Amino acid sequence: MADETVAQEVIINVPLRDAKASSRKRRADTAVSILRNFVSKKMKIDKGKIWIDPKVSEKIWERGREHIPSKMSVKVIKLEEGTTEIIMP
């Protein structure tokens, strides 16, 4: 995906503490959806056009499904054709 031209590139701090309100067994899943929703609102793009890098997902899941980070910093790259990538900075 790195071959396309970049329209916009920003680093965003995403608060994930709202995921701790969900059940312990669903926290990591909820954190991924919170990340997708947050980037969707900030970049004004449809949720279906967002691609999350596996390293970002591993960072959320690294301490298990119940103990997620309360916030994380990600790099968001908006491409010309309308898709958005979420990667680690």
Swiss-Prot record:
Gene Ontology process terms (BP): translation
Top-level taxon of origin: Archaea
Pfam families: Ribosomal_L31e
Alphabetical UniProt keywords: Ribonucleoprotein, Ribosomal protein
Assigned GO CC terms: ribonucleoprotein complex; ribosome
InterPro entries per the UniProt record, alphabetical: Ribosomal_eL31, Ribosomal_eL31_CS, Ribosomal_eL31_dom_sf
An MF annotation (GO) of this entry: structural constituent of ribosome
Gene3D superfamilies assigned: 3.10.440.10
Similarity comment: family membership: Belongs to the eukaryotic ribosomal protein eL31 family.
Name of this chain's protein: Large ribosomal subunit protein eL31
